[in-house]
Amino acid sequence: MRRHSPDALRGLVESYLGELAFAPELGALEEVLRYPLESGGKRIRPVLCLAVGEAVGAEAEQCLPAAAALELVHTFSLVHDDLPALDDDDERRGRPSAHVAFGEGVALLAGDALLAEAFRLALSYPSTAAARELAQATLGMIGGQYRDVTGDTSDLAALHRLKTGCLFAASVGLALSVAEVAEREQAPWRAFGAELGLLFQIVDDVLDGDGYSERHGAEAARALADEAAARAQGRLEAIPADTSVLAEIVAGLASRTA
């Protein structure tokens, strides 16, 4: 079976999202949904989903609806996070945030619609397993955001396992669901998925100078990121499959500069 490179997988995701048909009931709101989707995100979560899918024997195209659903949930979270009631950010990826470009009420509705569209995609499979996986991840992400908003940051690892880690874990879990991997064979894959969110978040904090970096210092935070990357690579080495593309993705997560 063909294995795509991370860049090729990202190209598949971009094409799929660009051609994705939203519900006609949304009318002109579709423009607002596409605005944050087309703002140049890295697509790390859907690329991971496709790479895991290929590693367990599925075709990348088979996993595209699930991968796109992940990106829609992630984008929904960004649109809502930027609102004045939460992070109050006026800019996202070098452009005005959705609430600045279209108004708070419209941005709120766009986020709601992105979430609904994500579940429409997840429910396009014969089994409901993908939708259940996505629901659990979304609830975890929201729970982590609640901790952040209410200032419950005493346990950063627990917060980030929810806020960031749940969608990364779902990148793996959704691929396993779509490929119908037997539950008894899922444990090493899920152990790998559990490492990814923390790795991503620590590197994020090093780049932004907050979170782990602010609490422990930049050098110590960088060491934590290296340890997280080593754990993720170790999890991959324990999996009896061709995980070379995933190893490349993990290395990219650990060394990213933006």
Where are these regions (language model features)?
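All-alpha prenyltransferase/terpene-synthase fold signal
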Residues: 1-258
